[in-house]
């Protein structure tokens, strides 16, 4: 009886990490103006969520730079428009834009960047979009982020 109890306890402990919420995602932005995903789900049990962005392409950031920006769906176009006006030296983001929930820096070929944000900034039922603010990229490089 004790052996069975010990075996069940051990299996429970070993499977716990498999049931834990995934509180990060790895995303790539390539030279074809594409993210490798168009949907991210954030588990509401996560206190923080991390996005790891990489650029496996060959082009530099002044030609094919990518960033990862999160806002509400309603704010996306305004963030993109104001970002284009801000220019390359500001990573195509308006400084201190309150509509931006989280963002990485602009990266080019072979570069990486990460951003971690508090999940408490997200509201269940709100529509969120992630996108790239490099001029012209948001038409293709975008996706949804959902809190569940």
Swiss-Prot record:
Superkingdom of source: Bacteria
Q: Where are the bilayer-spanning segments?
A: none
Span of the secretion signal? 1-20
State one molecular function term (GO): transition metal ion binding
> Chief location of this protein?
periplasm
Q: Which Pfam families match?
A: Copper-bind
Which residue windows are coiled coil?
none
**Cellular compartment(s):** Periplasm
**Cysteine disulfide partners in this protein:** 23-46
Q: Which InterPro entries match?
A: Azurin, BlueCu_1, BlueCu_1_BS, Cu-binding_ET, Cupredoxin
Q: An example Gene Ontology cellular component term from the record?
A: plasma membrane
Positions with a binding annotation for Cu cation? 66, 132, 137, 141
Keywords of the record: Copper, Disulfide bond, Electron transport, Metal-binding, Periplasm, Signal, Transport
Domain (Plastocyanin-like) ranges: 21-148
Which purpose does this protein serve, as stated in its record?
Transfers electrons from cytochrome c551 to cytochrome oxidase.
Protein's name in the database: Azurin
The protein's organism comes out as Pseudomonas aeruginosa (strain ATCC 15692 / DSM 22644 / CIP 104116 / JCM 14847 / LMG 12228 / 1C / PRS 101 / PAO1)
Q: Which gene encodes it?
A: azu
